[in-house]
Amino acid sequence: MGDVLVVFRVLPEDVDNDLSRLESKIREKLNGVCKINDIKTEEIGFGLKALNVQAIMPDEEGMADRVESILAGIEGVSQVDTKDISLI
């Protein structure tokens, strides 16, 4: 099996959350679980921003769900959605 690139949209709990701090927490929690390819800020509207996390992981059953659960458990995260999955 190969690897997959999964894009997660991470929404903060509040518009006032420090996204750079949240990005650091994401990198810390996912260290050793998967490889972070990139993290980009996405403007949602009305001052709300989200982080699009591109993660590379093995194409194993349940791996994307595991990473999504880790992201959802980070303090300051309101919601996590899987936006895209691509085989690489």
From Swiss-Prot:
Signal peptide: none annotated. The keyword DNA-binding does not apply. One of its GO terms (molecular function) is translation elongation factor activity. Coiled coil: none annotated. Pfam families: EF1_GNE. InterPro entries: eEF-1beta-like_sf (IPR036219), EF1B_bsu/dsu_GNE (IPR014038), Transl_elong_EF1B/ribsomal_bS6 (IPR014717), Transl_elong_EF1B_B_arc (IPR004542). Keywords: Elongation factor, Protein biosynthesis. Disulfide bonds: none annotated. Promotes the exchange of GDP for GTP in EF-1-alpha/GDP, thus allowing the regeneration of EF-1-alpha/GTP that could then be used to form the ternary complex EF-1-alpha/GTP/AAtRNA. Belongs to the EF-1-beta/EF-1-delta family. NCBIfam families: aEF-1_beta, PRK00435.1. This is Elongation factor 1-beta. The lineage of its organism: Archaea, Methanobacteriati, Thermoplasmatota, Thermoplasmata, Thermoplasmatales. The gene is ef1b.
